[in-house]
Amino acid sequence: MAESSSESDHFRCRDRLSPWAARSTHRGTRSLPTVEVTEKVNTITSTLQDTSRNLRQVDQMLGRYREYSNGQAGAIEHLKESLEQSIDQLRSQRLLRNSGGRSISVTSLSASDLDGGTGSELHHFPPTSPLKDYGDPQGIKRMRSRTGVRFVQETDDMTQLHGFHQSLRDLSSEQIRLGDDFNRELSRRSRSDAETKRALEELTEKLNEAQKQEVVSDRVERRLQELEREMRTERELVERRQDQLGLMSLQLQEALKKQEAKADEHEGAIKNKLRQTETEKNQLEQELELSRRLLNQSEGSRETLLHQVEELRTQLTKAEGDRKGLQHQVSQISKQQSNYQDEQGEDWRFRRGVEREKQDLEKQMSDLRVQLNFSAMASELEEVKRCMERKDKEKAHLASQVENLTRELENGEKQQLQMLDRLKEIQNHFDTCEAERKHADLQISELTRHAEDATKQAERYLSELQQSEALKEEAEKRREDLKLKAQESIRQWKLKHKKLERALEKQSETVDELTGKNNQILKEKDELKTQLYAALQQIENLRKELNDVLTKRALQEEELHSKEEKLRDIKSHQADLELEVKNSLDTIHRLESELKKQSKIQSQMKVEKAHLEEEIAELKKSQAQDKAKLLEMQESIKDLSAIRADLANKLAEEERAKKAVLKDLSDLTAQAKSRDEETATIITQLKLERDVHQRELKDLTSSLQSVKTKHEQNIQELMKHFKKEKSEAENHIRTLKAESLEEKNMAKIHRGQLEKLKSQCDRLTEELTQNENENKKLKLKYQCLKDQLEEREKHISIEEEHLRRMEEARLQLKDQLLCLETEQESILGVIGKEIDAACKTFSKDSVEKLKVFSSGPDIHYDPHRWLAESKTKLQWLCEELKERENREKNLRHQLMLCRQQLRNLTENKESELQCLFQQIERQEQLLDEIHREKRDLLEETQRKDEEMGSLQDRVIALETSTQVALDHLESVPEKLSLLEDFKDFRDSCSSSERTDGRYSKYRVRRNSLQHHQDDTKYRTKSFKGDRTFLEGSHTRGLDHSSSWQDHSRFLSSPRFSYVNSFTKRTVAPDSASNKEDATMNGTSSQPKKEEYGS
């Protein structure tokens, strides 16, 4: 644009030079003074040509600077787009995960759940979990009935934890995005303030020009001063941009340092975790070694018992061989009774010794059997008790951890929602401020138009005065003076221009350095993006592993239940076997009562009494252990009460923090009100100045009419008046300088306020870092839970192997007992027959001995007493079993109460979440209203652009009329020289003013177009996110539907119809916004074409 304006000026200068040269040659023949005048005019033209060339160079430099600024803006927009794309990707991943969690619950819902709910309750998707329906209370009640606390299947609780964790991450990402938007709005506000100040300065300068009808030299000097001011403002802008870029680079470096520190902390935490896991592994290995040693010891004891049983078997075989030999000897002795009576007595003694040995062996066998039975039963009972205790402890520990995690997540969500509310209020305040600023800009633009009209009228009157001055000879002297002044001013301007070129070169070097820094920052940002993607992939892998672990845990718990049922069956079968053993023992005792061996029975009863006493001692020990467990449970309840008190204290602290934040918001609102009052005062001042300028213009018109009637008298008066106005202008400049100082002070105050806002942003960033640390703690807890689950799996596998071994050993012992019982029955039958035969033989000869032998056992032993004692013992055991069952019932009742409390807590949490999501829906409605207001503002801007086009057409018509008037004046031969001189000066001034006006107009249009582009990009991205969300939800609904009927119901449900309506609504505003952008581009291109034509 700058190049086109310079080229048009070049062609105009060429057209002007050719008639000037012809006229100079024509006058050369007349007289020598005219030659001197022509030489002076030629020098002026050469200087003007130089100035035009310099102006072209300046225009080129400005064009390059604009291109560079456009490129820089494009790079910044590219960065914004990349950031927004990353945010959209994170949102899409979050939506996919949330939709995955929702699809699991969709299969469990019925058709009534999908059909329930009104449109107002279902048509709002909250940002954290958009696929959840928080408006249907019946569906919540149904989910409550399903999602009770179950220790068999705890996947529901874990999915809720995943949902909370994802919502935390989404809220943190939204906080970061809102912070970036807040910083953008601050920068935009500062730019708009600078532009308003610049416009006000231009207005004051133009109004001063309208007031003062100065000579062309003064006007040229003023124009040069304006150029210097503009260059200074551009320098200041460049310096500010450099400072901003430096601050941005410093902020990015600080952020990188923080991220590196966080990464180092994360690595240290991971190393600590690895060390803890290694120590835990070592402890587990030690425990396994101890368990192996105990198993080896138990196996060694079993092997010794088996060896003892085998030795007893060998002894029994030997005894059978001895018995057979004795039978043979008894048959021989029965034949030779008469001859061998002495030998018979010895044989009888020997038999008694053998029988005593047999009785001792049988006692040992019975003792060993009882020991084996009791050892097996005790070991199995102890193992079962240990397993149950461990499971109960683990379940209680997991429940406490889940409660702590849910509480922490709730606190974090509350804090983040509060932060979101604050940020939304701040955004609304900034939107109102921007609307007011736009209104003020429009008023300022109207004032500038009126001032331009006034300046044009003043120029017309000046042209008439110049025509009157051309009739007099004194004008030539003044012209020479003006030429000298113009030459001096042009020389000064050249020097200043050279200085400015040097400054621009320095600025270009600094800009190149800044571009290098920006490229480095972009590379670092790409690396950070790659790290983010890697972290997200790791999180997804961890989630998959957690789901696998949960499924494995559910399967293991089902296997444990099946194993418990098997153990119960085994216990019942064992009780049956014990009854059978008891029956067999009763038969044995009956046979022994028939054989009247009461001495043997007394010894057995003594041994059994000792064993029963040992069992009683063991039962007492178990009772003491149960009491200790009860005390531990009471202590755990006390700890839980202390934790609740701590949580109450934390809630009180959070409320205090909330009050402090509300105070800060009230301060911000007060500051905004003060700014609004300042803008109102400025607007009133501008209106007053406008009225004053209009009055002065009226006075000027009346004075110009009087000047036409009185030429020579009024010229002197005008000179005096001009001098007075110069003094007034100097005074006015001083007042303006004082006002500029005041404005600088106000700018310092605003900077202080901005620093306060930055400090608040830093506080918000610190809170975000705290939330990230909390997320890290949750990850640590998640890894600890994972390690505990792996340890449980190992422990369950070890228990399964131990149970299998015990079952094999029990079967082997059963087989051995059956063999021993059969052998015992056969041996006792043979012994009974032999004893009966011996008793018959001895009763023939010695009846008295038989009476003494039979009477002894009745005195020493009574079987009825033994039965009574055994019955009392059995009754006592039954009573103890009943007491233990009552204790178990009480503990189960307590567990049920705890579960009910947990259910109530979960229901309360769900109600709170519903309230929060309703608040979020209200805020979304407010955002929709704000978008509508923005569309109305865009329509108003379009109308104003059309008005600008009409005004430009009027300006072009005025320019054409002025050209026609100038052509008419050129027809007069005497006024040609004066008109050409003034025309050159006026064209140079007008060309510079046009370049300035075009630059300001194109800058305003560029800002408006960039604003529209940002809005359209944001809308398209929101539409894309909504479309991906809708596609994901639709596909998941199809995948997880139970049948084609459920699919048809889902499509006919109000939710799906709302989705379709939502997509239509999002497409319509985007198309409207595209049309608006097209109209804006068209309106902006029309004035450009008109300016090119001019």
Curated annotation (Swiss-Prot):
Broad class of where this protein is predominantly found: cytoplasm
* Keywords annotated in UniProt: Coiled coil, Cytoplasm, Cytoskeleton, Phosphoprotein
Report biased composition (Polar residues) as residue ranges: 328-342
User: Could you tell me which cysteines form disulfide bridges?
Assistant: none
Where, per the database record, does this protein carry Phosphoserine?
31, 249, 291, 331, 1061
Q: List all Basic residues biased stretches.
A: 1000-1009
| GO CC, alphabetical | centriolar subdistal appendage; centriole; centrosome; Golgi apparatus; nuclear membrane; spindle pole
Biological process annotations from GO: protein localization; regulation of gene expression; sperm flagellum assembly
Q: Where is the composition biased (Basic and acidic residues)?
A: 7-17, 987-999
Subcellular locations according to the entry: Cytoplasm, Cytoskeleton, Microtubule organizing center, Centrosome; Cytoplasm, Cytoskeleton, Microtubule organizing center, Centrosome, Centriole; Cytoplasm, Cytoskeleton, Spindle pole
Q: Which residue windows are transmembrane per the record?
A: none
Q: Which residues form a coiled coil?
A: 190-827, 879-959
Task: Cite the residue spans of the region called Disordered.
Answer: 1-29, 115-140, 319-345, 987-1018, 1067-1094
UniProt KW Oxidoreductase keyword: no
Domain of life here?
Eukaryota
- What is the name attached to this protein's record? Centrosomal protein of 128 kDa
Species, as recorded? Homo sapiens
Identify the taxonomic lineage of the organism of origin.
Answer: Eukaryota, Metazoa, Chordata, Craniata, Vertebrata
Gene of this entry: CEP128
